[in-house]
Amino acid sequence: MQLLSGPRFVSRLLGRKAQRPRSTRAHSSGALRAAFAAAGFAAATLAWAAGASAVASPVDRYPSAAAAYAVQIDGRLAWGRAIDTPRAPASLAKLLTAIVLLDKNWDPKSAIRVSESAAAMPAVHLGLRAGDSLRADDAMTAMLMRSANDACAALVEHAAGSFARFAHEMNERAHELGMSASHFVNPCGLDAAGQHTTARDLLRLAQAAYEYPAIAATVGRRNASIDTMAGEHLHFDNGNVLLGQMDGVIGVKSGFTSEAGRCLIALARRGPHEVWLVLLDSPNRWGVAAGILFEAFDLAAQSAPAAP
């Protein structure tokens, strides 16, 4: 399959003309820089190019992109909106769940039994039945790729016995990661009173999660097949449809609940450049993500030092 960049990928994916987030129309180096300046973005661009490691209030380059978003280019926070505003996490919380599970006495081959409560979890789910068993690593794959809540619940019950006990461990780990504006109530990211996070904290979480080889390998897969211990074969696709469709995208996680809206954390690498993107409540998250990543790599290439 031909890998596409920017809006062309969305055109093929959605079968309609792609729309970028509200931004520039020009792509040449001079025109793009002029557009930055005309829109009032020159100061943020210069700060990014100068090597600032953090920006307290990044430029809101894409006001229509999402309720909250953050864009980090080559380790520097470049653009964002409402990055410290509390938002529901949706299934992005499962990245923290995976970290806590892997930090425990993780045995990927251990048998995970599905309880009645796990089997009754709301969508998204695999359709596991009470009494089913599957390997821990297969349940982890389903949780991270498909956002399967039944697999998530089964893993958590096996590891901690209850959601409440596991949520306490999640909050301890979040504190260690510097996620000071986050609080978790359940491990699957379902809407719940008191459960909230921010775009800035989710950026920290995703980067920490990607340091775990088991997580990095899983979130970069386009599809997977697993078998229950009773021999039932299950096949599913990754919820992140950018994978395999947009050049350089290698992760990380999508999510949706009625309170959180459509959410996405994406990681893309092209040559020496790396872009992290967090979108929270973005109705057109795939088109928005494609447009932002396209322009982020454009900026990174322009700001790179000239070869000697």
Language-model features, listed with the residues they occupy:
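N-terminal secretory signal peptides that target proteins for export/translocation
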Residues: M1-G30
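Domain-terminus/edge residues, biased toward the C-terminal soluble/receptor-binding domains
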Residues: S180-H183, D191-P308
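Bacterial N-terminal signal peptides
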Residues: A35-A47
